[in-house]
């Protein structure tokens, strides 16, 4: 195929969508001919096509074989995955026979379909919100097809591919593949290794190093493909130990010869086996108890064991550092550190995080925390939790709980509340029980230690959603802010002289975070709470300080735990850390653009803690005894793995003198390079080797060959890049013809390895790959003294895939949860509004003889209820109205959050100024802007109508408050708070006051509409047994005064037919005595 850069424009794209009958299935399958559209653009087109009922084309035959598999010779141990396309049919469909098969297939899922349709229907019918096609876009979750998982080469395939090609350049290309992609361990046998070595041409490139240090080379370039990495490594050792040692050529790498490498590798295997056995020790053997040799201190067997293992791992890492960059060894070390991290988490116990001054509630919360997240080491808490509750005699549990509220913050400790009432640490809420929930307001701080506030997620939620703090509680919040500041200063803040943390210090940090209630799971919960929180201009400064400090601590802890979960002192983690930081930065900044300053502090701290690198002294010991060429190869190899220059290394590039290169003109050399670029042969670049010493060769080769190839590569979509072989060809050409450009080679190799190994694209990977592509462009500019800009299609396709995944992972779940909650809330509020409107249409009459209320509409009697029940209903309506005023604020918060997400997406995308000229990206931005506009319109319409509901409800609530005030004027609380005389005076004034009202005229047919709401309202207020009183019946009721009985208490009821009772006591003493005693007899 001719590499013509003019043939890079996207071809016409056709869309195939399912017909109307297929929309009932959960998954919407779509096909696209010639994969040139970005994911987001494609989603939008697919949605519009479906909604406009575009005819369906016949399903096309999928492509079964990826060319990359044939080119690379992937290991046979990797299973090939094919995608089966469902067959769609349409009577009106037509399709040409010559259409190419689809290159990439997308499967779009509609998990939120029903929820969102209900929401749209609700908005359209109730609030007259126009239903928009574009807003459906957010509810399509694109499931990216994993194109190529992490794969390794098969040595047998490499050997077979070299049968017909024995030139040094072909062998160099083969070694380049091995060093770039690594060999699968199960394909490396001693016979194949020997056969490969025998094919290498002596005194060419780095072939002598491979022949002389074969054990090191293959250990350095082999990946452990088995899940049991230790077993895979042991089998690899058995094969490598059978390779005969070759004679020395005069200079020798003392630490990398076959015998030395085998000896160290065997020691590594034995050490790892021993350490893994120790890390498998049951926690029971590590239970804290006084050490036999030091009974007078707080030292325990448990902590002695932990320190012993840490020391052994540190010693292991130091002793075997010279092989700690061989891929097979690196994977073993990485696996060991993962095991250590998991083990350390599961030796944490309740006793480790208990403070001496913990309150009763503190201890209960910490028991629940430890048992929930680290159950294997805290089984003993099941009995301790029950005993703690049974033995408490000084704490009144009533003070901990809220029996009437239903705010969302209460739900964060719902299961914990059930555990307390059931005295069972394993209890789970299945919706079968009703019980009071742990308080989340600031009053709970009377029973909760300041340093333990993060164990109470509901309280954190409550504080974040307040605009002001009561004056009497400001001191409590100040203490919390001081505690947060101390945590930031002592645990988080980067010191001026930043040094990498030792393994012991990293584990200590895990311990300190857990002591204040933070681990991976709780950090995620707090990030979710923070992402749904939006401060307003009228928020009190003390709350803003709380929010900023909390965000700093939670996000730092979150990134720390992610890094710690992946940590090992290897190049694997070094490269992984870059990706982690970019991923988390993208998530944080897209949530809140104003977090950019905060992110700088977080990333600096993480970089300081996890500063893994290579030293020059290590390199000198690593290459001890080696010659210049050997050191050069090893330096390049380390650079390609780490991707960074930790220390300079100067070397000379030896080239063969060839007079041919100097006897041709620059114009002739230009034509030769152009001919090579246009050649159909993938190995055509090898013919340029004789000309590589020409003074103009580097510049001409880069301009005529490299730049067009890079332009072609960056003009592909990411899916096409994965099946295109030209990037690999370019790497081989540069490795052969530009050997001194190791930075350029590294970035190209990284881009290639990323393209074939990645199985998930997110915003972090986009940032990293964008950086790599522009570094390639920068090196080209330096080499050619020109200004070259790569094409944008590749980066845009990756960016839009990343945003698709972001929408799927973060936005869609949030929208699903929020719309479901808002929809339920609005439905409940509408029912409440209808009840209020129905009561406004009624007239109530009281019968003073029996204290019953008769509720009528016009002449129709609706409900008869007792006065006490009526007043209770009035109080309940007022309480519900006040709760709705608070809970309806969540709709405003969700509007601010969603519009903020969309705005941040646009801002983030627009910040990539180099890509803004791309048409697909512009369509994406326009789509998100339209969605944002529709969201604003929808929420505005909802807000207007909710305000109308509130205005209507306010009329009734004001009337009910007046009725309640009249009833409460002589209540016991009112008398206690003032005096009996003042209450009687106020009651007298109310009795003679004139309260006029207007009766609404109600149509006769309206009675049938209002009656069900009124009946349901008063039926729900019939007296029932109080579950709370039952649960709290064990507590003795104490009082410091004799309470006044409420005015409408049963004992204040008027005596009926009093004339019948006159002179009842004028009887013989014996008869009167009998009348009094008889009711008391059983």
Curated annotation (Swiss-Prot):
Record's keyword terms, sorted: Host cytoplasm, Host Golgi apparatus, Host nucleus, Virion, Virion tegument
Free-text function comment from the UniProt entry: Plays an essential role in cytoplasmic secondary envelopment during viral egress. Interacts with the capsid via the large tegument protein/LTP and participates in its transport to the host trans-Golgi network (TGN) where secondary envelopment occurs. Modulates tegumentation and capsid accumulation at the viral assembly complex.
Quaternary structure, from the entry: Interacts (via C-terminus) with the large tegument protein/LTP (via N-terminus).
HAMAP family on file: HSV_ITP
GO cellular component, one term: host cell nucleus
Subcellular location field: Virion tegument; Host cytoplasm; Host nucleus; Host Golgi apparatus, Host trans-Golgi network
Name under which the protein is recorded: Inner tegument protein
One of the GO biological process terms: virion assembly
Record region (Interaction with large tegument protein): 604-1082
């Amino acid at each position: 195929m001719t590499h013509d850069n003019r043939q890079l424009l996207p071809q016409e794209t056709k869309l195939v969508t399912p017909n109307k009958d297929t929309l009932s299935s959960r998954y919407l399958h779509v096909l696209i001919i010639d994969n040139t559209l970005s994911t987001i653009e494609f989603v939008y087109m697919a949605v519009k096509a479906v909604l406009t009922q575009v005819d369906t084309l016949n399903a096309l035959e999928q492509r079964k074989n990826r060319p990359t598999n044939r080119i690379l010779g992937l290991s046979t141990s990797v299973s090939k995955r094919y995608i089966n396309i469902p067959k769609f049919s349409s009577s009106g469909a037509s399709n040409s026979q010559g259409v190419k098969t689809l290159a990439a297939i997308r499967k779009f899922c509609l998990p939120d379909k029903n929820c969102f349709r209900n929401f749209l229907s609700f908005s359209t019918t109730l609030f007259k919100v126009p239903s928009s096609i574009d807003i459906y876009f957010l509810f399509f979750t694109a499931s990216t097809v994993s194109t190529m998982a992490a794969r390794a080469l098969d040595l047998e395939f490499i050997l077979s591919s070299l049968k017909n090609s024995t030139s040094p350049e072909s062998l160099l290309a083969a070694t380049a593949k091995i060093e770039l992609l690594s060999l699968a361990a199960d394909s490396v046998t001693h016979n194949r290794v020997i056969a490969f070595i025998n094919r290498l041409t002596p005194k060419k490139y780095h072939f002598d190093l491979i022949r002389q240090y074969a054990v090191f080379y293959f250990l350095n370039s082999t990946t452990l493909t088995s899940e049991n990495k230790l077993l895979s490594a042991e089998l690899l050792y058995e094969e490598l130990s059978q390779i005969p040692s070759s004679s020395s050529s005069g200079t020798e790498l003392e630490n990398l010869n076959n015998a030395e490498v085998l000896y160290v590798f065997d020691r590594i295997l034995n050490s790892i086996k021993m350490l893994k056995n120790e890390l498998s020790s049951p926690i029971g053997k590590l239970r804290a108890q006084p050490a036999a040799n030091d009974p007078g201190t707080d030292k325990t067997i448990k902590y002695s064991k932990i320190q012993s293992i840490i020391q052994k791992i540190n010693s292991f890492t130091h002793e075997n550092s010279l092989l700690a960059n061989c891929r097979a060894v690196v994977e073993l070390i990485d696996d060991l550190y993962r095991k250590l991290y998991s083990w350390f988490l599961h030796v944490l116990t309740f006793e480790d995080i208990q403070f001496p001054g913990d309150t009763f509630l503190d201890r209960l919360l910490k028991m629940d925390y430890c048992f929930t997240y680290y159950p294997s080491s805290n089984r003993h808490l099941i009995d301790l939790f029950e005993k703690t509750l049974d033995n408490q005699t000084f704490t009144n549990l009533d003070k901990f709980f809220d029996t009437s509220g239903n705010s969302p913050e209460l739900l964060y400790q719902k299961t914990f509340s059930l555990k307390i009432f059931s005295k069972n640490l394993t209890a789970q809420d299945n919706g079968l029980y009703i019980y009071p929930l742990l308080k989340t307001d600031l009053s709970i701080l009377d029973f909760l230690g300041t340093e333990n506030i993060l164990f109470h997620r509901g309280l954190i939620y409550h504080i974040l959603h307040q605009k002001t703090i009561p004056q009497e509680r400001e001191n409590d919040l100040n203490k919390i802010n001081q505690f947060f500041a101390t945590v930031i200063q002592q645990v988080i803040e980067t010191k001026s002289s930043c040094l990498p943390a030792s393994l012991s210090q990293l584990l200590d940090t895990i311990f300190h975070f857990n002591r204040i209630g933070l681990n991976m799971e709780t950090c995620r919960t707090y990030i979710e709470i923070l992402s749904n929180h939006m401060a307003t201009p009228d928020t009190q400064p003390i709350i803003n300080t709380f929010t900023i400090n909390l965000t700093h601590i939670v996000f730092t802890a979150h990134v720390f735990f992610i890094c710690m979960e992946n940590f090992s002192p290897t190049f694997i983690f070094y490269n992984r850390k870059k990706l982690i930081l970019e991923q988390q930065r993208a998530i944080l900044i897209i949530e809140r653009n104003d977090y950019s300053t905060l992110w700088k502090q977080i990333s600096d701290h993480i970089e300081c803690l996890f500063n893994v690198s290579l030293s020059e002294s290590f390199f000198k010991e690593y290459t001890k005894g080696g010659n210049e060429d050997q050191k050069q190869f090893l330096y390049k190899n380390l650079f390609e793995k780490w991707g960074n220059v930790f220390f300079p290394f100067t070397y000379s590039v030896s080239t063969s003198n060839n007079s041919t290169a100097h006897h041709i003109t620059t114009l002739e050399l230009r034509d030769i390079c152009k001919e090579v670029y246009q050649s159909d042969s993938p190995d055509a670049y090898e013919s340029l080797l004789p000309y590589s010493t020409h003074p103009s060769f580097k510049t001409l080769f880069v301009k005529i060959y490299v730049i067009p190839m890079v332009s072609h590569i960056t003009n592909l979509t990411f899916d096409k890049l994965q099946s295109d072989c030209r990037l690999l060809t370019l790497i081989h050409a540069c490795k052969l013809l530009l050997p001194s450009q190791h930075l350029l080679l590294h970035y190209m190799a990284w881009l290639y390895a990323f393209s074939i190994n990645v199985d998930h694209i997110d915003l972090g990977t986009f940032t990293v790959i964008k950086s790599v592509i522009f570094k390639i462009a920068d090196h080209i500019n330096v080499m050619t003294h020109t200004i070259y800009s790569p094409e944008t299609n590749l980066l845009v396709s990756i960016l839009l895939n990343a945003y698709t995944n972001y929408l799927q992972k973060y936005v869609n779940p949030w929208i699903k949860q929020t719309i479901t909650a808002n929809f339920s809330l609005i439905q409940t509020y509408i029912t409440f509004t209808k009840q209020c409107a129905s009561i406004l249409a009624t007239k109530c009459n009281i019968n003073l003889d029996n204290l019953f209320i008769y509720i009528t509409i016009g002449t129709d009697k609706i409900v008869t209820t007792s006065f006490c029940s009526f007043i209770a209903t009035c109080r309940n309506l007022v309480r519900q109205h006040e709760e709705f005023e608070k809970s309806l604020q969540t709709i405003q918060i969700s509007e601010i959050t969603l519009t903020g997400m969309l705005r941040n997406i646009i801002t983030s995308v627009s910040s990539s100024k180099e890509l803004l000229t791309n048409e697909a990206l512009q369509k994406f931005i326009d789509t998100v802007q339209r969605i944002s506009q529709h969201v604003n319109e929808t929420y505005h319409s909802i807000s207007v109508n909710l305000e109308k509901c509130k205005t209507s409800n306010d009329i009734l609530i004001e009337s009910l408050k007046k009725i309640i005030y009249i009833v409460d004027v002589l209540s016991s609380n009112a008398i206690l708070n003032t005096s009996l005389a003042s209450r009687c005076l106020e009651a007298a004034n109310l009795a003679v006051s004139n309260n006029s009202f207007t009766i609404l005229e109600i149509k006769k047919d309206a009675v049938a509409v209002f009656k069900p709401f009124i009946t349901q309202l008063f039926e729900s207020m019939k007296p029932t047994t109080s579950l709370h009183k039952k649960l709290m019946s064990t507590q003795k009721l104490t009082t410091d005064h004799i309470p006044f009985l409420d005015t409408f208490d049963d004992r204040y009821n008027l005596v009926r037919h009093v004339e019948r009772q006159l002179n009842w006591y004028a009887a013989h003493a014996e008869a009167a005595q009998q009348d009094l005693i008889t009711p008391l007899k059983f």
